[in-house]
Amino acid sequence: MKVSVLLVCLIWFKVNFSVPVEDLDIFAEEVVQNEVEKGNFSNMPDNIRRIPRGICMNTYECRIEGGKSYGFCALGFGVCCVFRATCKQEVINNLTYFVNPDFPDLTRGMSSCSLKVKKIESEVSQIRFDFIHFNLGQPNRKTGICEEDVFKITGENTTKDLIICGMNSGQHVYVDVENIDELNVEMTLSKKAVSRIWEIIITQVSFSEGSPPGCLQYFTGRYGTVQTMNFADNGRHLANQDYNICIRQEENMCSITYEPCHENAFRISPNSEDTTINTNLLAEGSGDGESDDLRESFRAIEMCNDRIILPCDTEELIMPGMFNLAPGSCNLIHCGLSLCPSGNDPCKIESSATPFNIGVHFGNSAKPVSPEDNLGMCLNYEQIPCE
């Protein structure tokens, strides 16, 4: 019996996961409670009770690789090994927590922070960043540009760097690494007395389990909520954002509805003060007015420097007192202070266009505008079964 146990221990090897965070089969027994100070972070709860995610491996490997064991896994032959990294360190595992130096306390007085993320194997095509906590300084309130605190993800051959700031707890992003070996996370922090906290789960994802091409964010499930970056009561949508939010079409689902999370959940002011144009443009797909509709489409694009794109082929607006829309009506471009035309809230937009994608296109916002009119977007979605 002793020989058998010894043999099992000698041949025990690390279980290697390369799947999205929500699908990880995680083993952990210790509950971690962080007391988080209030202040600029009023959207965060006082007490956070959470079981950390980790990789099931033997105790020796966990210790040698710099991890910390949190309970047992694999019938007691392994431990749930949790890896944490902070500034000026490297990530060399497929699941690592990147935290501020004083975590779980707030960090003050830093000017910079950097992290390298090494791809662990050639099959990894994307790196997923889950912002469990992400509270940095706000962008310029009038322009939306991240001027003081900047969080940037770069790679040698990446086509575009991700740059964000502000409050992004609960958000996530996928970054393609198919043709590169490492990513760099660079944070530039202002010298102002701003309290900051971040806790980011970094996961390495194989090609078969990642997001579709061109999707910075990827949501699954019949129901869910999507938001633009830095969407908060005292926030402002960020400038220079150009990406797609993608939603997986679930089995036996043929269409999707979008509804603002609350009455102020869609506020993206247009460039012009001209109110004679409906920025939530109703453009007929065919008919005698097609040329006029095309001209109006270009005018809407010109007006909406900051805009949301909801692709559609047959779209229905469901609003109180509005039942006379022609078949095939399509609201492609959305900006202004309401998701629906003429401010007829509450409303739902239903679309059968696939894939279920939302385009976020925010310009450089060189012209100062009211931050209250540029909170950004928060939408609840629901997929509708096929008839």
Predicted segments, located by residue:
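Domain-level representation of secreted and single-pass membrane ectodomains enriched
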Residues: 2-387
